[in-house]
């Protein structure tokens, strides 16, 4: 999922994964066990998601001083049974239409998926009680829990799952994240336009509690993939049109319903028909904006219980006697990368891409970032992701090689090269440094501009610039979410339109491999192909921070940036 840079007073953050609760099921979902460190979700993206450099942050553990006194008590944020969270503004609350983390925060509370990911990155049952993968990985069978209901008490059945997933492939307006299940039979044909009938998708419901998914390959990954918000279940009344906010009237499948909505605050109410039981926190106030106020000041005043914060605030809060104990570092599976438009223009020539990549000192750019904000990337798959390929796949800085490659492509000293457009999402000094290095090392003048998030998404989808930047956060725990999903031929998230048969074969081998060592070897090969062909250049892995009210349990994160409200509970409640 795309993620934006977090700057300014409304910026957000994230925490470390605590031990998984003893119970493999409802204890994690609705009844927190023990008292893991409370924490917020990776909210820097919770403000809606794409664009330039990740501004999330993390403080190295040994720099954190021991608590000097207990953190601020919960004062005015709410009464018992209520939690107030800074969540940002969603661009969509429709599972089939959203494309950013900020929206996923809302979608995930209103609509439930078949599976979910716990703080230890384990796949847990949600609407599905169990699942089976065939020996060859080409069929996955999910068995739903009995007697599931939507928030209005109507039955939730397997046919609703089929209906919800088919909506991802609505002709003319497919989900931006539909490629996540590109290995399901019929999905690629629907995405390429070879088919316009969503009923050809390989998903069926032979009875009310069974969902059968036929795969081309990679069935072993499907239970993890469908934990992501796009695969949440919507009611039968949801047609092809986008689901819009309807306070008091929405039928949901998740832990909460939308009770009210204003320009500043959305209020969520616990769903008594939720499969894991009515959530312990009955009311959640989701703040869309602080209207210019500082999240630290608002938290200190008791106006919020969970808020993301900027890395600059995290640096001094670690030593603050009052707020320091409430500071949490959230796990963050995210990467910031720069990309090239490879379908047309000069960057369709691999030599031009290689020249530009070699003319920029990527490692120096990453090293100049504040370590509380990000760490240098070694490849597209972020640190902490299970199965991350080992090695350094970032292009080496070599000006002589860059000049030679550009000359071979027919542009000696940049002569004859058409105007290069570079649109960022607020990369600031890093973007400026890239423009300066290209001028100094290749003699190339780059036209640079920034755009707001919505306009930027539209531009990438309709008329991509020559160079662009994005941050991507994991949809599920798996390397393919950063390789095949972002760079596979025909993927809806492949912004630069790159296509490479050897890369596609490598990620297909990795996603279908039953042996972890074989999967690692295949994904390592895929990373090397990216490094050689340079459709994108990974720069940094983001880090995140939040403040969490003392006594709030169950707010641990899993690295995908979603705070599971159903698992929250006040100590002693």
Model-derived features: positions:
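N-terminal lobe/hinge region of extracytoplasmic solute-binding protein
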Residues: 3, 86-135, 166, 248-252
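A structural "hinge/loop" feature
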Residues: 87-107, 127-128, 154, 176, ...
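Extracellular/periplasmic solute-recognition and catalytic clefts
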Residues: 259-269, 285-344
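Append "and occasionally in soluble cytosolic enzymes with long acidic Gly/Pro-rich linkers
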Residues: 348-436, 440, 525, 572
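Ligand/substrate-recognition segments at binding pockets and active sites
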Residues: 407-474, 516
């Amino acid at each position: 999922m795309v993620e934006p840079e977090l700057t300014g007073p409304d910026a957000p953050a994230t925490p470390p994964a605590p031990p998984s609760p003893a119970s493999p099921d409802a204890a994690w979902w609705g009844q927190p066990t023990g008292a893991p460190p409370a924490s917020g979700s990776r909210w820097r993206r919770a403000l809606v998601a794409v664009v330039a450099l990740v501004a999330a942050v993390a403080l190295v553990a040994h720099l954190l001083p021991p608590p000097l006194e207990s953190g601020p008590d919960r004062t005015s944020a709410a009464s018992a049974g209520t939690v107030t969270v800074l969540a940002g503004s969603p661009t969509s609350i429709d599972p089939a239409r959203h494309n950013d983390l900020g929206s996923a925060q809302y979608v995930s509370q209103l609509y439930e998926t078949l599976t979910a990911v716990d703080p230890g990155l384990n796949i847990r049952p949600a609407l599905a009680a169990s699942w089976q993968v065939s020996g060859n990985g080409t069929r996955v069978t999910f068995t739903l829990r009995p007697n599931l209901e939507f928030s209005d008490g109507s039955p939730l059945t397997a046919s609703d799952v089929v209906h919800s997933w088919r909506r991802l492939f609505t002709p003319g307006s497919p989900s931006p994240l539909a490629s996540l299940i590109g290995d399901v039979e019929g999905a690629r044909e629907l995405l390429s336009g070879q088919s316009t009938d969503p009923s050809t998708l390989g998903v069926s419901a032979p009875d009310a509690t069974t969902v059968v998914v036929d795969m081309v390959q990679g069935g072993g990954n499907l239970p993890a993939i469908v934990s992501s918000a796009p695969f949440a279940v919507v009611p039968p009344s949801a047609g092809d049109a986008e689901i819009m906010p309807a306070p008091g009237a929405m039928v949901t499948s998740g832990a909460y319903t939308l009770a009210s909505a204003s320009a500043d605050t959305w209020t969520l109410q616990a769903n008594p028909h939720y499969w894991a039981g009515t959530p312990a926190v009955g009311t959640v106030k989701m703040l869309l904006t602080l209207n210019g106020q500082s999240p630290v000041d608002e938290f200190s005043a008791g106006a919020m219980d969970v808020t993301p914060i900027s890395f600059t605030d995290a640096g001094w809060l670690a030593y603050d006697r009052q707020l320091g104990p409430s500071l949490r570092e959230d796990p963050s599976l995210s990467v910031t990368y720069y990309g090239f438009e490879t379908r047309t223009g000069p960057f369709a020539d691999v030599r031009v891409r290689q020249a530009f990549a070699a003319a920029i000192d990527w490692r120096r750019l990453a090293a100049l970032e504040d370590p509380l904000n990000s760490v240098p990337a070694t490849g597209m798959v972020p640190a902490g992701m299970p199965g991350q390929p080992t090695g350094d796949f970032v292009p080496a800085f070599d000006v002589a090689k860059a000049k030679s490659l550009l000359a071979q492509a027919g542009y000696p000293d940049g002569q004859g090269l058409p105007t290069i457009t570079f649109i960022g999402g607020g990369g600031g000094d890093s973007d400026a440094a890239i423009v300066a290095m290209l001028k100094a090392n290749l003699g190339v003048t780059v036209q640079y501009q920034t755009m707001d998030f919505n306009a930027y998404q539209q531009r990438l989808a309709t008329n991509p610039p020559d160079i662009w930047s994005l941050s991507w956060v994991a949809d599920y725990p798996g390397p393919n979410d950063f390789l095949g999903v972002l760079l596979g031929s025909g993927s809806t998230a492949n912004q630069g339109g790159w296509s490479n048969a050897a890369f596609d074969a490598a990620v297909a081998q990795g996603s279908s491999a039953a042996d972890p060592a074989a999967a690692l070897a295949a994904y390592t090969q895929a990373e090397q192909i990216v490094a050689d062909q340079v459709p994108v250049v990974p720069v940094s892995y983001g880090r995140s921070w939040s403040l969490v009210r003392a006594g709030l349990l169950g707010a641990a994160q899993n690295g995908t940036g979603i705070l599971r409200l159903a698992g929250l509970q006040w100590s002693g409640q």
